Swiss-Prot record:
Residues 8-95 form the 2Fe-2S ferredoxin-type domain. The keyword rRNA processing does not apply. Homodimer. This is Xanthine dehydrogenase. Binds 1 Mo-molybdopterin (Mo-MPT) cofactor per subunit. Binds 2 [2Fe-2S] clusters per subunit. GO terms for biological process: xanthine catabolic process.
Length: 1343
C-alpha cells in the first residue's frame, strides 16, 4: 500500500448530505472543512486543542461488529477530515433551526436562559444531543460526564443544567403514564433532584417533548456499503500523506517503510503538536480499521483491549465487568475507571485510545501510572524479514527510556494491552491531582498495586508509580522494597513518606513549577492510598476497624459532583401590568434561539468575500530588545503571499496608538517591550498559509536589560508610569494612628486573570468606493476602533464605519485591545484594496491581549479594642504591563473601592502604576474594584482576628450607614447593605451551618470546612466624565415594525433584550415588533464603550428619550384615533408626513467629581450592593476543594429582566470564583506566558459550581437614578466570588489549628490547590526541604 500513488476519494455525510472530495488535505481539520468549505459556521473555534467544546459535533458511524450505529460527540478542531470517510457528521445546523423546527435540546437551553454570548452554545447543544442519541433518558451523572469537555464563560452553568435536567431520569413526574411528557403535551412536571428552583424563570410546560423517532436517519448508503470501512485509503497533499490500512499486514508494512510515521486514532496529541508546536509529520497512519487493533477479548486472567479501542469503550466494558464479576477481581478495573472519569472531556475519550496514551508517554499521563504499577502486558508486532513478528512487553521498570520514549521500536506497532484481573489479596488504587478536577492534566498522579500475605496486612509485594515527578512515569523501587514483609500501618507509612522524599527528588527549577507542592503530593497521595486500602482491609475483617482513627478515614475520599440544588427568587410583576409590557418579566435573550441553532453570526462567521486575504501576525519572541533585522523575503517568496506590513509602512505618528495615551504601536518599531508584541503582519490567501508565512519572517534582536516582570521587580527598579504615585486623603491618618488602641500592618496580593471570552479577537475589513472602509469587529468600543483606524489610514472618521453585531464574550477584554487586530487588518485592506480578515488563535489571543491587573497591597490599619476601624494607610500597586492602556483608571477604582462596605474616618490611599515587560494589562469585569475590595476584606478579617471577635460582628460594627461619606467625598444614599446581609444570613441558614461546620471539623482531620460572608459595594459610572453618555436611533416603518439602534454592544449580557423591553414599554407595543440589527458607528456616532456596567443605564435612557420624541409626535394622532392600533397610528402618521425616525441622547447627571475643580459632584451615579455566603470543603492532603453552597442576595433595584439579571449574577460569581481560587497565569521569569490555552489555564467548569446555588434579588428597593428604577448588574456580583477564597482560608486555619499553628498566614489569590495544600502544614510537608528563595531560578513566577 505504501507504494500506492493514487489518491483515494473521501466520502462522508454532513447533516444528511453526501460530501465527496477527490483531493482532501490531510492537514485539514473537520472544523476547518465545515466552516471554510461547507460554510457551516455554527460550529465554533474556541481553542483548537480540544479543551473548550465550542467545536463539538456528533459523528455517527456503523459498528459492523455489533451491527449498531454509534453516535459520538467529538472535537471538530482536532478531528482530521480524512478520518471522516464513511461517517455521518451532524452539526448544530443539522438538528433544527428557527426557520423550520427547533430541536428540544436547542429550545430548552434557550428558554431556560442557558445562552448569553452564545459562542459556546452550539457545542453544548451538540454534547447534549449526542447524549440523547445514545441514551434517550439519561441520568444526572450522564449529564455531568457529557459536559466535562465544555466550557462556558458567561452563564455560571446553572441555567444550562436546569434546562437539560428536564431530559433526565431524575426529572420525574408523579403523574406516571399520564405525564404530559408521555402524552406529548410538553412538561410542567415534577423533579426528583430536590431543586427548589422558582420555575417562573421559564415555563417547562412550553417545552416540546423529545421524540427520538424524529431524529435524522443514518445514511442508508453508509449502512449498506461495507467497503467504506474495508477499503484501504490514501490521501496526499503537498506536505503530508494520510494512510488508512485495513489489515495488520498493511499497517506493519507502512510502519516498516516509514518508521517515523505517526499512528493517529483520536489525533488528540498529534493535532496539538501540529497546531501549536508546528510539527510536520509527512506520514500519518490511521489504524482504526485494522481488526487486530480493535479486538476485545476476555480470559480467566485478563481482559485484552486492542490499542485503538477508544477510552469510552474501555470504560463501558470495564464498568460492565465491575457489575458482573466479584469485587476482588475488578480492583484494577475500578482503578482504571476512576482515572478515566477525570481523563480529559468526553469528546476526547470518545476517540482517544489507550495505545496512544502509552506510546505518547506523557510524564503526566493519567493511565500510564496505573498500567505501570500493574505491570501491564503489551502485545507488539512488526515486520521482520517480510514476516510478522510478535513479542510481549511489560510496562514496569525500564519500559520508559526517556521523555516520550519507550522500549517499543519505531518500526513496531502496539497491538493491545492486557488488563489483569486482581486476586483477593491484591489492591490497586490510584489518585490524580490537577488544578481542576474535570478535564485537566495532572500535576501529580500516583498508582499503587499491592499484594498482601493471605488474609493479613503484611505486604508481599508492592509497586508504586508516579506521574509528574520526572520526564517519564517513574516507579519507587527502593521504597517499595522497604515495605515488603512489613504490616501496612501508620508506622510503615511514615517511613514510606520519608523514603519517598529521598527517592523522588525534584530540582528547584524543574519544568512545571510547584516543586514543593508536587513533592508533598507524592507522600500525600500515598497516604490517601494507605487510608483507602486500610479501609478495604477493615471492611474485609483483616484489620481492626480501629486501625484507622475515625477522624482520619475521610482522608481517603475524593470529591464528587453533587446534583445541583438551586433557587432564584425575584419580585414578580403585579397582576395589573399589561401583558404587552415586558419590564420586570424574565424574557428570553433576544438571540438565544439563533445562538442555540448556530444561526447567530459572529465576526468570523461572515461569509468569505471575493479576493479576501487573511492576515497572519508576526509576534515578538523577546521580552525587551532592539530589533536589529526584519526580513520577510522568505515569507513573500511563498505562492499566495501578497504583502508584508511593518512599522516601515506607517509614519511615526500613524504608528502611535492607544485608547487614551498614544504610547503603543500598531507594529513594534525600534524596540519590543514584551513577548507577543506585534512586529509585523503577512497577508496571504488563507489562514494556514498566512500563519506559516508569518513564522518565516526573520526578526533579529539585541536583548536589553533589565527585564521587569513582577510588581516587586518594578518596585525594586522604581519602574512606574509618570505622575505616579497618586494619593487620596481623608481626615488625619497620622493623628488617628497616634491615638489608636491597636495598629496592624499587613499585605495581600492577587494575580491577574485571563478574559477567556470564547470568541477571540476578530476583524474583517472591506474597502469600499469613495475611499470608505467598512470594519466588522469583535469590539466593545466600535467608536474607538473607528477613530484609530481613521488615524492609521489618515482617513476622516466619516469614511470609516465599524460594525459589531454581537460578541462571543468580552468582559472588558475587548474594550481597548481590539485595536491589536483591527488596525493591522484595516491597514492591509486599505493598502491592498482587498477584503482582509484575521481571527486570533487562542494562544495568540492570550499572548497578545493582556489580562486583569495583578495587584499588591500594603496597609496599616488603626482600630479600637472592639474592632472599630479608625484609620487606614494603604499602598496599591498594579502591574500595568508595558503601556498605560486603562491602567490608571483601573488603579483609581481600586483606590476608591478598597474600603468596600466599611466606614473608615481617616484614610490615605496611595497608588502606583507599575511599568513592566508584559503585554499591556487592561479592563476586566470589575475594573480594579474586586482587587481593591480584596484588600478591604483582608483588613476587616485582620482586625477581627486581633481583637478576638467574630468577623460578622466586626463587619456590622464598621458598615457604612446611609448618609455616610466615602474617602472620595461621596454621600451614600439608600445604602441597604445590612438588609442584604440579614436576608442572606437567613437564606443561607448561616448560624445553623456554623454549628455544622464546627462539628465536621472536629470529626475530620484531613477534610476541613470553612464559611465566609462577603458584602460588596460597587460604584456605577465611568471614571471619566465624558464617557457617561449614550445615543439611540429609532426608525418606525410603515407596517409598524421598529428598528432600534443604540450605542451599546451586545456581548451576551442581554443588553439588546433589555433595550427592546424598554422601548416596548415606552411605546406601548409588543417586543415582537422591535428589532435590533447591530451596533454601528453610522447609526449612532461617538459611542462610549460598552463597559463599566452602565450599558443599560446609559443606552436605556437614550432609548427612552427617542421613544418620548416619537410619542409626542404620535400623541395628536392617538387622540384623534383613541381606539386605533399601533399599525393604524403609524400608517396615519406616515400619510400625515409625521417623522417616524427619532434620535435619543442621555448624559448621566450629577457626576464628574474632582477634589479641586468639581468637589460637589458624585464620582458614581449610585452603588449596587450585595452579600454572598459560601461554604467550602478542602482536602488538606491534596489542596483540592469544593464549594458546597453559595447564597447571594443582590440589590439591583427593580429588575428589567430577572432572568438576565440572575444570569449575570451567577456568571459574575463564577468568574469571580475562578479569579480568586482557580485561574492562575503562568509566566516564565522572562515574562513569557506559559498558560496560553485551556490545557494550562483553567477556568471553572460545570463540576465547579456550588452544590447549592441560591440567588435572591432584594425586593422593594427601586433606584431613582437609572432606567425604570433598575440597577447595573454586570460587574458588582463578581467580588462575591471571593467568598469561596475566604471560606477556603477559614478551612485552612482550622487545619493549621490542629497543628498548633494559630497565627495568621499568607494566602495569595488565586487559592490554587498548591497554595491550599502548602498552607495546611503537617507532618508530610514538614518532611520537605524547601530551597531558599533566590538560590535558584524558578520555572515560573507570579507577575
Amino acid at each position: 500500500m505504501s507504494g500506492q500513488q493514487k489518491t483515494s476519494e473521501l466520502v462522508f455525510f454532513v447533516n444528511g448530505k453526501k460530501v465527496t472530495d477527490t483531493n482532501p488535505d490531510p492537514e485539514c481539520t473537520l472544523l476547518t472543512y465545515l466552516r471554510d468549505k461547507l460554510r457551516l459556521c455554527g460550529t465554533k473555534l474556541g481553542c483548537a486543542e480540544g479543551g473548550c467544546g465550542a467545536c463539538t459535533v456528533v459523528i455517527s458511524r456503523m459498528d459492523r461488529g455489533q451491527n449498531k450505529i454509534r453516535h459520538l460527540a467529538v472535537n471538530a478542531c482536532l478531528t482530521p477530515v480524512c478520518a471522516m470517510h464513511g461517517c455521518a457528521v451532524t452539526t448544530v445546523e443539522g438538528i433544527g433551526s428557527t426557520r423550520t423546527r427547533l430541536h428540544p435540546v436547542q429550545e430548552r437551553l434557550a428558554k431556560a436562559h442557558g445562552s448569553q454570548c452564545g459562542f459556546c452554545t452550539p457545542g453544548i447543544v451538540m454534547s447534549m444531543y449526542a447524549l440523547l442519541r445514545s441514551a434517550e433518558q439519561p441520568s444526572m451523572r450522564d449529564l455531568e460526564v457529557a459536559f466535562q469537555g465544555n466550557l462556558c464563560r458567561c452563564t455560571g452553568y446553572r441555567p444550562i443544567l436546569e434546562g437539560y435536567k428536564t431530559f433526565t431520569k431524575e426529572f420525574a413526574c408523579g403523574m406516571g403514564d399520564k405525564c404530559c411528557k408521555v402524552n406529548g403535551k410538553g412538561c410542567g412536571g415534577g423533579d426528583d433532584t430536590q431543586s427548589v428552583t422558582d420555575d417562573t424563570l421559564f415555563e417547562r410546560s412550553q417545552f416540546q417533548p423529545l421524540d427520538p423517532s424524529q431524529e435524522p436517519i443514518f445514511p442508508p448508503e453508509l449502512q449498506l456499503t461495507p467497503t467504506y470501512d474495508s477499503e484501504s485509503l490514501i490521501f496526499s497533499s503537498e506536505r503530508v500523506t494520510w494512510y488508512r490500512p485495513t489489515t495488520l499486514q498493511e499497517l506493519l508494512q507502512l510502519k516498516s517503510d516509514h518508521p517515523s510515521a505517526k499512528l493517529v486514532v483520536g489525533n488528540t496529541e498529534v493535532g496539538v503538536e501540529v497546531k501549536f508546536k508546528h510539527f510536520l509529520y509527512p506520514h500519518l497512519i490511521n489504524p482504526t480499521q485494522v481488526p487486530e487493533l480493535l479486538e476485545v477479548r476476555e480470559s480467566e486472567e485478563s481482559i485484552y483491549f486492542g490499542a485503538a479501542v477508544s477510552l469510552m469503550e474501555i470504560d463501558a466494558l470495564l464498568r460492565q465487568r465491575i457489575e458482573e464479576l466479584p469485587e476482588a477481581q475488578t480492583r484494577l478495573f475500578q482503578c482504571a475507571v476512576d482515572m478515566l472519569h477525570y481523563f480529559a472531556g468526553k469528546q476526547i475519550r470518545n476517540v482517544a485510545c489507550l495505545g496512544g496514551n502509552i506510546m505518547t508517554g506523557s510524564p503526566i499521563s493519567d493511565m500510564n501510572p496505573v498500567l505501570t504499577a500493574a505491570g501491564a502486558r503489551l502485545e507488539v508486532a512488526s515486520l521482520v524479514g517480510g514476516k510478522t513478528s510478535h513479542r510481549t512487553v511489560h510496562m514496569g521498570t525500564g519500559f520508559f527510556t526517556g521523555y516520550r520514549r519507550n522500549v517499543i521500536e519505531p518500526h513496531e506497532v502496539l497491538l493491545g494491552i492486557h488488563f489483569q484481573k486482581t486476586t483477593p489479596d491484591q489492591h490497586v488504587v490510584a489518585f490524580k491531582q490537577a488544578r481542576r478536577r474535570d478535564d485537566d492534566i495532572a500535576i501529580v498522579n500516583a498508582a499503587v498495586n499491592v499484594r498482601f500475605e493471605p488474609r493479613t496486612n503484611v505486604v508481599a509485594g508492592i509497586s508504586m508509580a508516579f506521574g509528574g515527578m520526572a520526564p517519564t512515569t517513574v516507579l519507587a523501587p527502593r521504597t517499595s522494597q522497604l515495605m515488603v514483609k512489613q504490616p501496612l500501618d501508620h508506622h510503615l507509612v511514615e517511613r514510606v513518606a520519608e523514603s519517598l522524599c529521598g527517592e523522588l527528588p525534584l530540582a528547584a527549577s524543574a519544568p512545571g513549577g510547584m516543586i514543593a507542592y508536587r513533592r508533598a503530593l507524592v507522600v500525600s497521595l500515598i497516604f490517601k492510598a494507605y487510608l483507602s486500602i486500610s479501609r478495604k482491609l477493615s471492611e474485609a475483617g483483616i484489620i481492626s476497624t480501629d486501625a484507622i482513627p475515625a477522624e482520619e478515614r475521610s482522608g481517603a475520599e475524593l470529591f464528587h459532583t453533587p446534583v445541583l440544588r438551586s433557587a432564584q427568587l425575584f419580585e414578580r410583576v403585579c397582576s395589573e401590568q399589561p401583558v404587552c409590557d415586558p419590564i420586570g418579566r424574565p424574557e428570553v435573550h433576544a438571540a438565544a434561539l439563533k445562538q442555540a441553532t448556530g444561526e447567530a453570526i459572529y465576526t468570523d462567521d461572515i461569509p468569505r468575500m471575493d479576493g479576501e486575504l487573511y492576515l497572519g501576525l508576526v509576534l515578538s519572541t523577546k521580552p525587551r530588545a532592539k530589533i536589529t533585522k526584519l526580513d520577510a523575503s522568505e515569507a513573500l517568496a511563498l505562492e499566495g503571499v501578497h504583502a508584508f506590513f511593518s512599522h516601515k509602512d506607517l509614519t511615526e505618528h500613524e504608528n502611535e496608538v492607544g485608547p487614551v495615551f498614544h504610547d503603543e504601536h500598531v507594529f513594534a518599531a525600534a524596540e519590543v517591550h514584551c513577548y507577543g508584541q506585534i512586529v509585523g503582519a503577512v497577508a496571504a490567501d488563507n489562514k494556514a498559509l498566512a500563519q506559516r508565512a508569518a513564522r518565516l519572517v526573520r526578526v533579529e534582536y539585541e536583548e536589553l536589560a533589565p527585564v521587569i516582570v513582577t510588581i516587586e521587580q518594578a518596585i525594586e527598579h522604581g519602574s512606574y508610569f509618570p505622575d505616579y504615585p497618586r494619593y487620596v486623603n481623608k481626615g488625619n491618618v497620622e493623628e488617628a494612628f497616634a491615638a489608636a488602641e491597636h495598629t496592624y500592618e499587613g499585605s495581600c496580593r492577587m494575580g491577574g486573570q485571563e478574559h477567556f471570552y470564547l470568541e477571540t479577537h476578530a476583524a474583517v475589513a472591506v474597502p469600499r468606493d469613495s475611499d470608505e472602509l467598512e470594519l466588522f469587529c469583535s469590539t466593545q468600543h466600535p467608536s474607538e476602533v473607528q477613530k484609530l483606524v481613521a488615524h492609521v489610514t489618515t482617513l476622516p472618521a466619516h469614511r470609516v464605519v465599524c460594525r459589531a453585531k454581537r460578541l462571543g464574550g468580552g468582559f472588558g477584554g475587548k474594550e481597548s485591545r481590539g485595536i491589536s487586530v483591527a488596525l493591522p487588518v484595516a491597514l492591509a485592506a486599505y493598502r491592498l484594496r482587498r477584503p482582509v480578515r484575521c481571527m486570533l488563535d487562542r494562544d495568540e489571543d492570550m499572548l497578545i491581549t493582556g489580562t486583569r491587573h495583578p495587584f499588591l497591597f500594603k496597609y496599616k490599619v488603626a482600630f479600637a479594642s472592639d474592632g472599630l476601624i479608625t484609620a487606614c494607610d494603604i499602598e496599591c500597586y498594579n502591574n500595568a504591563g508595558w503601556s498605560m492602556d486603562l491602567s490608571f483608571s483601573v488603579l483609581e477604582r481600586a483606590m476608591y473601592h478598597f474600603e468596600n462596605c466599611y466606614r473608615i474616618p481617616n484614610v490615605r490611599v496611595g497608588g502606583w502604576v507599575c511599568k513592566t515587560n508584559l503585554p499591556s494589562n487592561t479592563a476586566f469585569r470589575g475594573f480594579g474594584g474586586p482587587q481593591g475590595m480584596f484588600a478591604g476584606e483582608h483588613i476587616i478579617r485582620d482586625v477581627a482576628r486581633i481583637v478576638g471577635r467574630d468577623v460578622l460582628d466586626v463587619m456590622r460594627l464598621n458598615f457604612y450607614k446611609t448618609g455616610d461619606i466615602t474617602h472620595y467625598n461621596q454621600k451614600l444614599e439608600h445604602f441597604p447593605i445590612e438588609r442584604c446581609l440579614d436576608d442572606c444570613l437567613a437564606q443561607s441558614r448561616y448560624h445553623e451551618k456554623r454549628t455544622e461546620i464546627a462539628k465536621f471539623n472536629r470529626e475530620n482531620r484531613w477534610r476541613k470546612r470553612g464559611m465566609a460572608v462577603i458584602p460588596t459595594k460597587y460604584g456605577i459610572a465611568f471614571g471619566v466624565m465624558h464617557l457617561n453618555q449614550a445615543g439611540a436611533l429609532i426608525n418606525v416603518y410603515g407596517d409598524g415594525s421598529v428598528l432600534l439602534s443604540h450605542g451599546g454592544v451586545e456581548i451576551g449580557q442581554g443588553l439588546n433584550t433589555k433595550m427592546i423591553q424598554c422601548a416596548a414599554r415606552a411605546l406601548g407595543i409588543p417586543i415582537e415588533l422591535i428589532h435590533i440589527s447591530e451596533t454601528a458607528t453610522d447609526k449612532v456616532p461617538n459611542t462610549s464603550p460598552t463597559a463599566a456596567s452602565v450599558g443599560s443605564d446609559l443606552n436605556g435612557m437614550a432609548v427612552l428619550d427617542a421613544c418620548e420624541k416619537l410619542n409626542k409626535r404620535l400623541a395628536p394622532i392617538k387622540e384623534a384615533l383613541p381606539q386605533g392600533t399601533w399599525q393604524e397610528w403609524i400608517n396615519k402618521a406616515y400619510f400625515d408626513r409625521v417623522s417616524l425616525s427619532a434620535t435619543g441622547f442621555y448624559a448621566m447627571p450629577g457626576i464628574g467629581y474632582h477634589p479641586e475643580t468639581n468637589p460637589n459632584a458624585r464620582t458614581y451615579s449610585y452603588y449596587t450592593n450585595g452579600v454572598g455566603i459560601s461554604v467550602v470543603e478542602i482536602d488538606c492532603l491534596t489542596g483540592d476543594h469544593q464549594v458546597l453552597s453559595t447564597d447571594i442576595v443582590m440589590d439591583i433595584g427593580s429588575s428589567i429582566n430577572p432572568a438576565i439579571d440572575i444570569g449575570q449574577i451567577e456568571g459574575a460569581f463564577m468568574q469571580g470564583y475562578g479569579l480568586f481560587t482557580l485561574e492562575e497565569l503562568m509566566y516564565s521569569p522572562q515574562g513569557m506566558l506559559y498558560s496560553r490555552g485551556p490545557g494550562m489555564y483553567k477556568l471553572p467548569g460545570f463540576a465547579d459550581i456550588p452544590g447549592e446555588f441560591n440567588v435572591s434579588l432584594l425586593t422593594g428597593a427601586p433606584n431613582p437614578r437609572a432606567v425604570y428604577s433598575s440597577k447595573a448588574v454586570g460587574e458588582p456580583p463578581l467580588f462575591i466570588g471571593s467568598s469561596a477564597f475566604f471560606a477556603i482560608k477559614e478551612a485552612i486555619a482550622a487545619a493549621r489549628q490542629e497543628q498548633g499553628l494559630t497565627g495568621d498566614f499568607p494566602l495569595e489569590a488565586p487559592s490554587t490547590s498548591a497554595r491550599i495544600r502548602m498552607a495546611c502544614q503537617d507532618k508530610f510537608t514538614n518532611l520537605l526541604e524547601i530551597p531558599e528563595e533566590g538560590s535558584f531560578t524558578p520555572w515560573n513566577i507570579v507577575p
